[in-house]
Amino acid sequence: MSQDAPSCFTAIISPADRVQVLAEALPYIQRFAGKTIVVKYGGAAMVKENLRDLVIRDIVFLATVGIKPVVVHGGGPEINSWLERLNIPVQFVGGLRVTDKITMEVVEMVLAGKVNKSIVQMINQAGGSAVGLCGRDGSIIEARPHQSAQLQPDIGFVGDIQSVNPKLIQSLLKEGHIPVLSSVASDENGQAYNINADTAAGELAAALDAEKLILLTDTPGILLDKDHPRSLIRKLDIYQARKLIAEGVVDGGMIPKVQCCVRALAQGVRAAHIVDGRQMHALLLEVLTDQGIGSMLVASELV
């Protein structure tokens, strides 16, 4: 293998091992060729340079072998950094960013500008053809003000998703591009809203009739015991996922991620994955190997 070989093989020592990896990946490449996979990109995999490079190369690898990746990203740490630079208070209520007018301007500047274009450039430098977008472009995502079942203070321009129009994304995929979407959207009057990136990824996956939704996180996946990584649940269905939430096994920040997966599955996405983005080549390991590395959710265990 030449020095220009994809980095996904650099950690593998022997030629025999390399051949084994390719042999194991082949049926998955054949199975998912032409299929759409929506990747929510965030967490440590977005912040740490070594992991960031590997995720980008994984995305380009998937596109190169005929799979159609779509990237949806957040950028919380970068937003916080810029708010602090501008002496704007960083506030959260119930896990949601308090987003007043000036904060919304910073959120849009950072997500749709700096973070989005950085990801696009990295993909292009790695050999892909990425196009940067936000939910406002082509009216991909229409937002509405966030509604909470609990009484809470006004949190400003935090939005829920009213509807998704996938036509622009579909056109880009048809032309061989990798769409990269930031989670900023507008309501019917053109007001910008900050949308949860997990939610945006899940709803977009459903609208695209995607084969897979993959959430890159900073946890191994869904754990029976959150203090023991070896208690990873590798496969579960919608009923089991809801049961784990009701029993309190799934709690805290994992609840909205699991709910996002469940909603995507209920709308026709074939599988949803919660994957540890801190693992090297997490995407390739989850999509192209027999065992995977995270938790896979399906509509029914019969699938």
Swiss-Prot record:
Top-level EC class as recorded in UniProt: transferase
GO biological process: arginine biosynthetic process via ornithine; L-arginine biosynthetic process
Binding-site positions, substrate: G75, G76, R97, N194
Cellular component GO terms held in the UniProt record: cytoplasm
Chief location bin: cytoplasm
Localization: Cytoplasm
Pathway: Amino-acid biosynthesis; L-arginine biosynthesis; N(2)-acetyl-L-ornithine from L-glutamate: step 2/4
EC number in record: 2.7.2.8
Catalytic activity line of the entry: N-acetyl-L-glutamate + ATP = N-acetyl-L-glutamyl 5-phosphate + ADP
A Pfam match: AA_kinase
Site (Transition state stabilizer): K40, K257
GO molecular function: acetylglutamate kinase activity; ATP binding
Entry keyword set: Amino-acid biosynthesis, Arginine biosynthesis, ATP-binding, Cytoplasm, Kinase, Nucleotide-binding, Transferase
NCBIfam families with a match to the protein in the record: argB
Family: Belongs to the acetylglutamate kinase family. ArgB subfamily.
Biological role stated in the UniProt entry: Catalyzes the ATP-dependent phosphorylation of N-acetyl-L-glutamate.
HAMAP family in the cross-refs: ArgB (MF_00082)
Protein name: Acetylglutamate kinase
Organism: Gloeobacter violaceus (strain ATCC 29082 / PCC 7421)
